[in-house]
């Protein structure tokens, strides 16, 4: 479970009810739209809580808590986690388990904002491409990446740059902060074969392909 924020449909409980799969929580940083301390309620069920070190969470089972910073790699059983950087707070996660690789960007994105000073936007661009240059994995099974509506015309800049560097079998749009993302003609022209999942509402579920 990455960056548990809110679950109005109680989907997590439903998914866990009849599942014997191991449960891991990942928290990329402390922002309220990425970190909900209510994740403690699954403390007995969860195998581990893997979090950026800027997240404060008290637990009865402190041994289940693992704090990371960008550059760290952690192995728990058959799970290998590498934390990459962010262009806001915290970090991003690359997770390998059971022959599958998942990337979750957290707040890693090309944060270009209309109306901000040009120097700030240029610095944001530089920081984003610097983080991308660190990625060694060129193919992943699933990638979760922001497409933030508040960025207006720059909404797709980050995800398109990411897709130039990494080829995910499935791209999951997240962090919409407004109107649901509908890929532009330019995006579809550049990436006509890219499989997408763009959730329509909180609680949407997609069955993963084996």
What does each model-found stretch correspond to?
Residues 28, 50-69:
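Glycine/small-residue-rich loop that forms an oxyanion/phosphate-binding "nest" at active or ligand-binding sites
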Residues 8-9, 30-35, 55-59, 74, ...:
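Active-site environment of divalent metal-dependent phosphoester hydrolases
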Residues 63-74, 87, 134, 155-210:
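Binuclear metal-ion centers of metallo-dependent hydrolases, dominated by the metallo-beta-lactamase
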Residues 36-46, 181-188:
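Metal-dependent catalytic neighborhoods of phosphoester/phosphodiester hydrolases
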Residues 1, 73-82, 94-102, 207-210:
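Beta-strand-turn-beta hairpins that frame and shape the catalytic cleft
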Residues 1-5, 21-33, 49-54, 103-107, ...:
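Active-site neighborhood of phospho(di)ester-bond hydrolases with catalytic His/Asp-centered motifs
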Residues 1-30, 37-42, 108-137:
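Pre-active-site segment of Zn-dependent metallo-hydrolases
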Residues 87-164:
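Active-site-proximal loop/helix segments of hydrolase catalytic cores
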């Amino acid at each position: 479970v990455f960056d548990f924020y809110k679950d109005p449909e109680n989907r997590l409980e439903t998914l866990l009810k009849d599942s014997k799969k191991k449960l891991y929580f990942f928290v990329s940083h402390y922002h309220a739209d990425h970190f909900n301390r209510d994740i403690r309620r699954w403390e007995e069920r969860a195998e581990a809580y893997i979090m950026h070190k800027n997240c404060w969470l008290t637990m009865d089972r402190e041994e289940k808590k693992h704090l990371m910073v960008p550059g760290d790699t952690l192995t728990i059983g058959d799970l290998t986690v590498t934390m990459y950087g962010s262009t806001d707070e915290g970090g991003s996660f690359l997770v390998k388990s059971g022959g599958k690789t998942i990337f979750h960007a957290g707040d890693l994105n090309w944060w270009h904002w209309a109306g901000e000073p040009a120097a700030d936007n240029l610095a944001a661009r530089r920081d984003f491409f610097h983080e991308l240059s660190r990625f060694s994995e060129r193919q992943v099974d699933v990638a979760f990446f922001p497409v933030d509506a508040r960025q207006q015309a720059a909404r797709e800049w980050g995800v398109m740059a990411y897709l130039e560097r990494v080829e995910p079998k499935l791209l999951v749009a997240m962090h919409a902060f407004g109107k649901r993302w509908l890929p532009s003609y330019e995006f579809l022209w550049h990436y006509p074969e890219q499989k997408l999942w763009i959730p329509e509402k909180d609680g949407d579920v997609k069955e993963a392909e084996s």
